[in-house]
Structure formats: structure tokens, C-alpha cells
């Protein structure tokens, strides 16, 4: 069982975003930063060196973007949560984004094995004029092998706050078995995805652009977050939801910052 910790602090120096502080304990590790989009946007890749999460693991991450910094954080590979040994596996993530800073939190998908027990909690605290774009893609069972999520449990809790006020609170729970088949659960799908953007106002034209993609899976798009956007996906294709979320990310970059997004090179193995 692992008790892994990761701490990252970003600061601005000479108009560049730098990682000012790194503290990591196994199995968590961070690659050296990349700057494919210029010095004020730091691409960061988090690795899980053990290859997967097992019952009893507790992984904690604390990430702080100081004022006027910009970062993109992704993972080196898909996450895996293995069948439980009777204990719950946990992942706890706290993110603080100071004034005029922005973070794109774009991890690769997580695969929840049949019989896994996993609980994750993500909290984001935003400063004034700061922005957040994050997604979560979760596959239940190794469906490529014919495996379904027939036993186990998955809990996900997202919280996004600004100045002590909640902007987005989302709690999900899925138990293996009948909830996979039911319409209020996965409707016999294997995969769900959520993308949340909070920053600048999102107009109807942008909403229509995001909706204007042909998907086999079910999807929903709304801007009821106020200055933000919410996208949901339920289906069976990892490639489809990744492509859609990637296109939404690129549209938001173009519309909100007048800048073309550059794909992190670790994604080229998708």
C-alpha cells in the first residue's frame, strides 16, 4: 500500500511560469517541465510509477499556482484502479489558483477494474480573474477484454470555489452491478466523462460550436455555471470522448485567450 504525496508550487519570474517547489514521494513523480507554448505556460506531466492504485492506497496532491502563472497538467498514462483487497483506495487533490492565474487540468482516463473500491476528492479554490479547465474520463471495467464493473464502488467529489462561494459541487457514486445497466446510472455504457470550464462568460455561439460534433455516445452541454461551461459524456469509446474534450479545449483556448492550443506530446501515444 502506498501513501504517496505530491506538492507543486508555480511562480512567475521574468514573465515566465516556473515550478518553484516540488515535493514528491513514491509512487508519485513529476517530469521536468516543458514549454512548447512559450515560457508563460508550463506543461507538467505527473507519473504514477507503481502502475496502478490498490486498496488502502492514499494519494494526496497539493498544487498552488501563484498570481499570474499559467500551467497545463496531465498524466503520463491512463490511471488504473485494481480490484480491492477489502480496503478503499483514495485520491485527494487540493488546487489553489491565485489571482489572474490559469490551470488546465487534463489527465488521461482512469480505468476502474471490476471489484475496485475507489474514492476521489478534488477541490479547487480560485482567485479573482483566475480560470480553470478540468476534465475527468472514467472507464468502468476493462471492456476491451469483455470485463464489466459488476462489483465494487466508485465515488467522485468535485468542488470549485471562489472567494468562499461554491461555483461547482458535483458528487457521484456508482456501485458495480445493476447501476451499470440502469438509465440513471451508465445505461449499459462503460465510460463517462465530465469537462468543466470556469473563467470568462460563455456565449451561445460557443455553446453551439461545442455541440456541433457527431458522437455515438450521449452528451450534454450547458453554460449554467455562470462564467463557465459544463460538458458531459456517456458512451463506450475512449477515443471519442478524448477527441471531443480535446476539441472543446482547443475551442476555449481560441475563444478565451486568442491562442491555439498545442497538444502535449505525451498524448501522441493515445
From Swiss-Prot:
Main location: cytoplasm
GO molecular function: nickel cation binding
Cell compartments where the protein resides: Cytoplasm
Organism superkingdom: Bacteria
Any one GO CC term of the record: cytoplasm
Keyword terms of this UniProt record: Chaperone, Cytoplasm, Nickel insertion
Function: Required for maturation of urease via the functional incorporation of the urease nickel metallocenter.
Complex and partners: UreD, UreF and UreG form a complex that acts as a GTP-hydrolysis-dependent molecular chaperone, activating the urease apoprotein by helping to assemble the nickel containing metallocenter of UreC. The UreE protein probably delivers the nickel.
Family membership noted in the UniProt record: Belongs to the UreD family.
Protein name: Urease accessory protein UreD
Source organism of the structure: Microcystis aeruginosa (strain NIES-843 / IAM M-2473)
